[in-house]
């Protein structure tokens, strides 16, 4: 069963997510199974943990949270 999160934060105008996206671990596990998925939205980052590889998904989730905290004093993580 997937675990879905919305990482809400106020991104600065002109925010470019390229650096965080380029630092993410591969979302594909051996056997071509998806470990996690994400999308960059106006209100923050949407993240889906496929429950395939908790270590890799956790690393990716942490990178998104750290990126939000670099640019905003308040970050809200919703478990959807």
Predicted regions and their residues:
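Short, extreme N-terminal segment that most often corresponds to the first beta-strand
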Residues: 1-21
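Short, intrinsically disordered low-complexity segments
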Residues: 22-66
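A short amphipathic beta-strand at an alpha->beta junction
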Residues: 72-80
């Amino acid at each position: 069963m997937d675990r879905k999160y919305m990482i809400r934060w106020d991104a600065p105008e002109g925010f470019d997510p390229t650096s965080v996206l380029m630092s993410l671990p591969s979302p594909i596990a051996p056997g071509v199974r998806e470990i996690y998925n994400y999308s960059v939205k106006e209100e923050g980052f949407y993240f889906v943990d496929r429950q395939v590889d908790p270590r890799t998904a956790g690393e990716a989730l942490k990178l998104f949270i750290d990126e939000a905290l670099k640019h905003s004093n308040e970050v809200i993580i919703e478990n959807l």
